[in-house]
């Protein structure tokens, strides 16, 4: 079975939620006590570890892709595209008909192309020099860190930036003028 990691005791019309693994222990436990309506039977040849990655990775990815309103014909930049959430973002953006450029380490480039990215760029490169300014409709980043400002510069006017992580560092540089002069939307 799979257990919904973000439980909503008051239903989906309420923003009240309880996060398994944050609000209480048990996100990756072998046994956990939860309400029956938060449990979903699964028949699959996947291991428990493989199945256990789906709600977190794909749930986070779908939330960012949906909230940033990715649509067919748009160009999306995905930072951290070789990780669980990032690779899910690549696949979910492609399903919506977007063109996807992925930022990854050199050793992961072929794998990220295999899962659906149209283009890959080395995470150690100068992102703006490599990709150009104002070429993406959406940036989805679950890394944070030193590339944050560069990624904002790659957004077109009216672009959307979604973030769900900071493994590259939680403190970033931001020139506020980039945000308001380009009319960007930041989504957390």
Protein language model regions, located:
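Local beta-strand N-terminus motif with an aromatic residue
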Residues: 29, 73, 117, 135-136
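Glycine-rich phosphate/adenylate-binding loop and adjacent beta-alpha elements
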Residues: 1-40
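Glycine-rich phosphate-binding loop and adjacent beta-alpha segment
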Residues: 16-17, 104, 143-188
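Short, structured coil segments at secondary-structure junctions
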Residues: 35, 115-116, 157, 182
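Conserved "cap/hinge" positions at secondary-structure junctions
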Residues: 3-5, 80, 104, 165
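Short amphipathic alpha-helix with an adjacent loop that forms part of the alpha/beta core around
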Residues: 125-134
């Amino acid at each position: 079975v799979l257990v919904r990691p973000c439980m909503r005791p008051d239903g989906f019309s309420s923003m009240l939620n309880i996060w398994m693994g944050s609000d209480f222990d048990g996100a990756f436990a072998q046994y956990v006590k939860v309400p029956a309506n938060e449990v979903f039977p699964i028949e699959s040849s996947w291991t428990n570890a493989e199945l256990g990655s789906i709600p977190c990775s794909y749930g986070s990815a779908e939330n960012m892709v949906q909230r940033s309103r990715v649509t067919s014909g748009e160009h999306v930049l995905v930072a951290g595209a070789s990780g669980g959430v990032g690779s899910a973002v690549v696949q979910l953006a492609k399903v919506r008909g977007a063109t996807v450029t992925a930022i990854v380490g050199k050793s992961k480039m072929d794998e990220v192309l295999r899962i659906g990215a149209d283009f890959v760029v080395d995470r150690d490169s100068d992102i703006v020099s490599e990709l150009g300014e104002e070429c993406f409709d959406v940036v989805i980043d679950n890394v944070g860190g030193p590339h944050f400002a560069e990624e904002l510069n790659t957004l077109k006017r009216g672009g959307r930036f979604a973030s769900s992580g900071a493994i590259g560092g939680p403190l970033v540089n931001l020139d506020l003028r980039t945000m308001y002069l380009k009319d960007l939307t930041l989504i957390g």
